[in-house]
Amino acid sequence: MALFKINKGEIMNFVNSTQLKTDIPNFDSGDTIIVHNRIVEGKKSRIQKFEGVVLRRRGSGSSETVIVRKESSGIGVEQSFNIHSPLVEKIEVIKYGKVRRAYISYMRNRSGKSARIKELNKQ
């Protein structure tokens, strides 16, 4: 007979909350951000910047992810980042955009002027 009942969910929440970053800026889909990502190649490591529009921010806690899309040489490039990963050094918000959806997948079919997003003046 067990004297104490162990709640595994509470233990997992406690462990996850200790590993969360506190310097994450407030951003949503449609915003333009720069993600400073640490890349390890052999014994060397460097920081690579990835600037683009946030297509989706999803999840909560330590499993929160963001999909960022940019257009490089006329080709669309998307990359998914775990926000609280130790490989993500810093996230900067460049512009705040106004969109009406949480997941703006329709941006994948657009390029040029049709891919513009209305800018918000947030401070």
From Swiss-Prot:
GO terms for molecular function: structural constituent of ribosome. Pfam families: Ribosomal_L19. InterPro entries: Ribosomal_bL19, Ribosomal_bL19_CS, Ribosomal_bL19_sf, Translation_prot_SH3-like_sf. One of its GO terms (biological process) is translation. GO terms for cellular component: cytosolic large ribosomal subunit. It comes from the Bacteria. Keywords: Ribonucleoprotein, Ribosomal protein. SUPFAM superfamilies: Translation proteins SH3-like domain. This protein is located at the 30S-50S ribosomal subunit interface and may play a role in the structure and function of the aminoacyl-tRNA binding site. NCBIfam families: rplS_bact (TIGR01024). Belongs to the bacterial ribosomal protein bL19 family. This is Large ribosomal subunit protein bL19.
